[in-house]
Amino acid sequence: MNTATLSSILLESHKPAKLETIPEDSYSSIFVFKWLEYLCERVGHSNVPDVLEFYYNLGWVSDKAIAKLLKFSKGIGLDDDEIETSVGKLTIADHLVSLLFIERLNGKKVSSEALDKLEWEIRRIKKGAEQYYGI
C-alpha cells in the first residue's frame, strides 16, 4: 500500500453524524433530558457514556453532541433505588427509541403512521425470519 492510499484512508472525509449539535432551545433541552432519563433507566447512569460512544461509532451522534449530552447527564440525579439497578443491555427497540429522539432533536417529526408502518415492517421481518430459520 502506497503512502497516498494510506493517507487517504487515514484522512477520510468527515461524514456528518445524524445529530451534529444539540439545539439551544428549551424544547430540545426537554427532549435531551427525557432521552437521557430513558437511557439511565435502561442501562444505569454510569453506562450512558458507553451507549453514546456506541451511537458515535454508528454515526448517529457527533463528538460535539456527545460532549453536550454528557454535560446534561451530569445534571441528572437518581433516587437511591434507581442507582445502578438497571445495568442491562439495550434492545433493538431501545436503540430505535434513541434514533427517534435523535430525529426529533434534528427537528424531524415522526408521524404515528410512520411508526405504525415501521412496527408492521419489523413484525413482518421477524415473522419471515421465524418461518425461514425456524426461530
Curated annotation (Swiss-Prot):
InterPro entries per UniProt: Arch_fla_DE (IPR006752), Flagella_assembly_related (IPR052494)
Intracellular or extracellular location(s): Archaeal flagellum
Keyword set, alphabetical order: Archaeal flagellum
The keyword Calcium is annotated on this UniProt entry: no
GO CC entries: archaeal-type flagellum
Chief location: other
A biological process from GO: archaeal or bacterial-type flagellum-dependent cell motility
Keyword Acetylation: no
Similarity annotation: To M.jannaschii FlaE, also to FlaD.
Entry protein name: Putative flagella-related protein E
Organism, scientific name: Methanococcus voltae
The gene coding this protein: flaE
